[in-house]
Design a protein with these regions (language model features):
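ABC ATPase NBD coupling module
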Residues: 1-18, 36, 44, 50, ...
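A short, surface-exposed alpha-helical micro-motif characterized by mixed small hydrophobic
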Residues: 143-145
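Short, glycine/charged-rich "phosphate-handling" switch motifs in NTP-dependent
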Residues: 149, 161
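Conserved ABC ATPase "signature" region
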Residues: 52-71, 180-181
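Charged, flexible cofactor/metal-binding loops and thiol motifs
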Residues: 163-222
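A short, proline-enriched helix->beta-strand linker immediately N-terminal to the Walker B motif
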Residues: 95-99
Length: 222
């Protein structure tokens, strides 16, 4: 894909790979209706005209469980709540039934209740469509709830990868251990200081050979 021509990428984006962005208000175009934004990929990849794409956009809205989709399809992003806007972003990503779904922090801007609903929806849709998914997140709770395997990255490099259960039970890398240790525990004493990872992320100009986390843990990685 890195070496693919732009003309080839036009046929891949939306059709074979769908992307769900983290901030629905900025991901959606405020001057276009919901139906037009969903229909764009249908016109590009399915050869539909504007009217056909608008009518076909109702089905993705039904799939993501938006009530009254026949009405919502002609509304604009500002008329929807944050949770509904995120469902529209998901509908756009899934309109052409892609084989791979990339979800970039899909619940960051949502409250906890809506977050749980969106994660459950994504899981159901993935099973329904038989798609694979890549979830990009900093939320370890979301990872534990939604993923089968996990890749931990630090400063642009993979530092650890493992099945989710194994990673939470037996983290190997110091950065992973630091992340897990920083999760607040209900059993902790009220005035106990929360564990933190010391230091700052190094500048790209200061990276040293080996493990990029070594400057924060005091031990050079092999």
């Amino acid at each position: 894909l890195v070496q693919a021509k732009e003309t080839d990428m036009h046929g891949i984006r939306g059709r074979h790979i769908g992307v769900i962005f983290q901030e629905p208000m900025t991901a959606l175009n405020p001057v276009h209706s919901i139906g037009r934004q969903i229909g764009e990929s249908l016109m590009l990849h399915r050869g539909m005209n504007t009217r056909e794409a608008r009518d076909a956009a109702i089905q993705p809205l039904q799939r993501v469980r938006i009530p009254a989709p026949e009405q919502r399809v002609d509304e604009f992003p500002h008329q929807l709540s944050g949770g509904m806007r995120q469902r529209v972003v998901i509908a756009i990503a899934l309109a052409c039934h892609p084989e791979l779904i990339i979800a970039d922090e899909p619940t960051t801007a949502l409250d906890v209740t809506v977050q749980a609903q969106i994660l459950s929806l994504l899981k159901d849709l993935q099973a329904e469509m038989g798609s694979s998914s890549i979830l990009i997140t900093h939320d370890l709770g979301v990872i534990a709830q939604s993923c089968d395997s996990v890749v931990v990255m630090y400063a642009g490099r993979v530092v650890e990868k493992a099945p989710v259960r194994e990673l939470f039970a037996n983290p190997r890398h110091a950065y992973t251990k630091g992340l897990l240790a920083s999760i607040p525990q209900l059993s902790s004493m009220r005035k106990t200081k929360l564990p933190t990872i010391p230091g700052q992320v190094a500048s790209i100009a200061d990276f040293v050979p080996g493990c990029r986390f070594c400057q924060r843990q005091g031990v050079r990685g092999q």
